[in-house]
C-alpha cells in the first residue's frame, strides 16, 4: 500500500489455505449421490490479487471524499469438477474484473463506502458500507490513512452456489431417489452417482421404495454393436438378469437419449440424455424387464433375451386410477442364431401397459454386405391369460417366425396394435393367432387407409378360434397364406364378433376367407 496526501495505490493478495473447495454435483450433470439436482452446489475460496488507485476529490474535501478504481483476478484451480461436460476443469476458472468505489466521512467516526464490481463470473456486484470507527476517521493525511484498515474485495473472494435438490410432487415432495448402474465402475459401489453398482440385480435389490429410479449407463455393454465392427452383433458385455420393480411407480431408465422426470422444484429434468448409444440388456433364461406396478422404462436395446419385456402381476400401480406401466424407446432383437427369443410376453396380468417407440426385430446389413433379419424365434407379442389392456403404438414389428401376435386364454381386457403410416407391421412367420380369448383385439393404422399389417404367412394369415371378444382388423394386407388347408382369414367357433375393414387378401393354393360355426 502506497499512501500520499493526494491519494493512494493499493494491492491485495488472496492465498486461501486448508480445504478451499466443496461441491455437490457438477454443472450439466443432474446427479449427486442418490439425488437429482436442480442446481449443483459450490463453496470455494478464491486465490488471486487486486490492484486499485485512489484520488481525493477536491470538491469533497470536507468529507475526505476519495474515488478509487481498480481491477482484480481470482480463481480456484486447486479442485476440478469430477463429472458432467466440465469434468476435469477448474471449479472456478480464473476470471478478471474491474471496480470503482467512493469513500467519504460524513461526520466524525462515521465512514461511508459505495462500490460496484463487474466481472465475467459474478457479473455486477457491489456493496454499500457504513462503518463506525473508534478514535476518529479523518483520512486526508498519511498518518490518518495508516490507521485505517486495508480495503479488500471480501464480497467476491468466495464463490457460493446453494445446491437445490429435485423434489417429486407425486411422492409428497420428497427428493427423487436414484440408484446408478455402470458395468465399468471400479471398485463396485453402493449405487450412488459417484460409486455405481455394476449390475442390474444389485440395483434392483436396492430399489425398494415407490418412485425409485434406476439409471443404467452404457458402460461397455455395446461391444460389437457398431455396424462397422467385423464382429457386428456378437455382444459380449451386456447387462444380464431381470429388472422387476419391488414397489409402485418405479423407473428403469437407460442413458443415451432424453428422458424427463417432473419436479416440483424446477420443472422437468432430463436424466437420460447423456451422449452415447443406449445400454444393452440380455437375459438368455428369462425376461430382461418385467412390467408391474406402473413401472416406466425407457432407452434400452434388448438383445438375445428369452423374453424382451415380460410381466409380473398387475401392470398398473395400486389404487383407483393407478399409473399404467410404460415402455418407450426400446429395441428388441436377436443377433445369436442359436438363441430362443420372444419380444413382449404378458402372462396372466391385469392392469394396463403402454408401449411407445418399441421396435421388435430389425433387418441389418453386415459389414460384408450380407442382409440379416434379427427377429424373434418364438413370436413378437404374446398375451396369455388375465385381462390386461395392452396399447402398442409408434413402433415397428418385423416377425419371421411363429406368430407376430398371439392372444390366448384372456378373461377380458384389450390388445391394441396401431401402426404408423408407411410403417406397417411385417409378418412372414405364422400370422396372427387369437384363441380362447374373452378380451378384445384391434389391429389398425394411425391413419385409416394406410396398411396396418402386411402378412406373408406360413400358416393362416389371421386365425381366430373359440373367442368371445371383439376382434377388429383394419387395413390388413394378406399377400399369402400357407397353402392347402390354410386360409388368409380363418374363423372357427367364435361366439364373439370379428370385424374386418379394408381387408386385402391375395392367396395361392389356399383359401381366402374361411368361417365355420362363427358368429
Describe the predicted segments one by one.
Residues 251-305, 336, 424-425, 445, ...:
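Right-handed parallel beta-helix/beta-spiral solenoid domain characteristic of secreted/periplasmic
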Residues 163-206, 210, 218-222:
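Right-handed parallel beta-helix/beta-solenoid
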Residues 178, 211-213, 220, 242-243, ...:
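Detector for repetitive beta-architecture
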Residues 38, 79-86, 186-188, 223-241, ...:
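Surface-exposed intrinsically disordered loops and tails
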Residues 217, 253-255, 292, 303, ...:
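Feature marks extracellular polysaccharide-active and adherence modules
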Residues 225-227, 263-264, 285-289, 304-311, ...:
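Short glycine/acidic-rich loop motifs that flank beta-strands on beta-rich extracellular proteins
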Residues 17-68, 74-84, 88-90, 105-113, ...:
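Flexible, glycine-rich linker and terminal segments associated
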Residues 211-265, 284-285, 305:
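N-terminal extracellular ligand-recognition/capping segment immediately after the signal peptide
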Amino acid at each position: 500500500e502506497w499512501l500520499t496526501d493526494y491519494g493512494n495505490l493499493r494491492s491485495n493478495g488472496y492465498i486461501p489455505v486448508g480445504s478451499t473447495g466443496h461441491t455437490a454435483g457438477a454443472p450439466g450433470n443432474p446427479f449427486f449421490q442418490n439425488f437429482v439436482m436442480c442446481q449443483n452446489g459450490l463453496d470455494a475460496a478464491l486465490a488471486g490479487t487486486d490492484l486499485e488507485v485512489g484520488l481525493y476529490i477536491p470538491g469533497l474535501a470536507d468529507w475526505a471524499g476519495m474515488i478509487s478504481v481498480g481491477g482484480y483476478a481470482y480463481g480456484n484451480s486447486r479442485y476440478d469438477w469430477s463429472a458432467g461436460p466440465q469434468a476435469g476443469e477448474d471449479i472456478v476458472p480464473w476470471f478478471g474484473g474491474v471496480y470503482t468505489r467512493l469513500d467519504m466521512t460524513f461526520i466524525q467516526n462515521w465512514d461511508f463506502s459505495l462500490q460496484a464490481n463487474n466481472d465475467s463470473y459474478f457479473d455486477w456486484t457491489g456493496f454499500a458500507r457504513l462503518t463506525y470507527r473508534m478514535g476518529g476517521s479523518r483520512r486526508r493525511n498519511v498518518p490518518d490513512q495508516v490507521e485505517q484498515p486495508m480495503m479488500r474485495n471480501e464480497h467476491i473472494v468466495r464463490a457460493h452456489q446453494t445446491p437445490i435438490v429435485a423434489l417429486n410432487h407425486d411422492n409428497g415432495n420428497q427428493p427423487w431417489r436414484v440408484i446408478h448402474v455402470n458395468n465399468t465402475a471400479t471398485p463396485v459401489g453402493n449405487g450412488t452417482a459417484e460409486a455405481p453398482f455394476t449390475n442390474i440385480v444389485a440395483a434392483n435389490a436396492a430399489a425398494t421404495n415407490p418412485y425409485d429410479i434406476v439409471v443404467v449407463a452404457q458402460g461397455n455393454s455395446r461391444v460389437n454393436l457398431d455396424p462397422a465392427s467385423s464382429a457386428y452383433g456378437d455382444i459380449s458385455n451386456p447387462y444380464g438378469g431381470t429388472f422387476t420393480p419391488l414397489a409402485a411407480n418405479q423407473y428403469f431408465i437407460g442413458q443415451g437419449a432424453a428422458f424427463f422426470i417432473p419436479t416440483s422444484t424446477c420443472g422437468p429434468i432430463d436424466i437420460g440424455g447423456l451422449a452415447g448409444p443406449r445400454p444393452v440388456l440380455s437375459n438368455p433364461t428369462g425376461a430382461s424387464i418385467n412390467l408391474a406396478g406402473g413401472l416406466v422404462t425407457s432407452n434400452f436395446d434388448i438383445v438375445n433375451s428369452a423374453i424382451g419385456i415380460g410381466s409380473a402381476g398387475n401392470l398398473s400401480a395400486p389404487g383407483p386410477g393407478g399409473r399404467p406401466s410404460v415402455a418407450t424407446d426400446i429395441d428388441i432383437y436377436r443377433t445369436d442364431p442359436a438363441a430362443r427369443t420372444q419380444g413382449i410376453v404378458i402372462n396372466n396380468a391385469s392392469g394396463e401397459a403402454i408401449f411407445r417407440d418399441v421396435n421388435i426385430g430389425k433387418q441389418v446389413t453386415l459389414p460384408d454386405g450380407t442382409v440379416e433379419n434379427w427377429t424373434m424365434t418364438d413370436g413378437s407379442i404374446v398375451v396369455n391369460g388375465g385381462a390386461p389392456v395392452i396399447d402398442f403404438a409408434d413402433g415397428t414389428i418385423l416377425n419371421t417366425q411363429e406368430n407376430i401376435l398371439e392372444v390366448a386364454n384372456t378373461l377380458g381386457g384389450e390388445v391394441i396394435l396401431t401402426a404408423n403410416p408407411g410403417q406397417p407391421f411385417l409378418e412372414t412367420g405364422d400370422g396372427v393367432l387369437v384363441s380362447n380369448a374373452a378380451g378384445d383385439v384391434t389391429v389398425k393404422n394411425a391413419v385409416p387407409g394406410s396398411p396396418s399389417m402386411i402378412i406373408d404367412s406360413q400358416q393362416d394369415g389371421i386365425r381366430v378360434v373359440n373367442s368371445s371378444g371383439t376382434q377388429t382388423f383394419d387395413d390388413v394386407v394378406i399377400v399369402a397364406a400357407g397353402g392347402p388347408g390354410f386360409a388368409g382369414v380363418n374363423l372357427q367357433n367364435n361366439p364373439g364378433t370379428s370385424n374386418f375393414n379394408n381387408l386385402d387378401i391375395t392367396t395361392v393354393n389356399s383359401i381366402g376367407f374361411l368361417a365355420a360355426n362363427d358368429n
